[in-house]
Amino acid sequence: MEFREQVLDLLTEVAENNVIKENPDVELFEEGIFDSFQTVGLLLEIQNKLDIEVSIMDFDRDEWATPNKIVEVLEELR
């Protein structure tokens, strides 16, 4: 499976919302799709399933605002 698809699947799973795959430019926080608890869960899932460590200190809400932006950040980190 392609890395981008893995990330989108992970985001969809954590958010419990298919809009992520339908619109990868959706604003996750502005639209209320992600909250702080889901963000922490996402960071844990990224570490567990993708073997990429992201600390909460590295998390920047603007850089992680959309699924596409998250894919870009994670591609740089892996």
Swiss-Prot record:
Post-translational modification: 4'-phosphopantetheine is transferred from CoA to a specific serine of apo-DCP.
Entry keyword set: Cell wall biogenesis/degradation, Cytoplasm, Phosphopantetheine, Phosphoprotein
Molecular function GO labels: D-alanyl carrier activity
Superkingdom: Bacteria
Reported function: Carrier protein involved in the D-alanylation of lipoteichoic acid (LTA). The loading of thioester-linked D-alanine onto DltC is catalyzed by D-alanine--D-alanyl carrier protein ligase DltA. The DltC-carried D-alanyl group is further transferred to cell membrane phosphatidylglycerol (PG) by forming an ester bond, probably catalyzed by DltD. D-alanylation of LTA plays an important role in modulating the properties of the cell wall in Gram-positive bacteria, influencing the net charge of the cell wall.
NCBIfam families assigned: dltC, PRK05087.1
Protein name: D-alanyl carrier protein
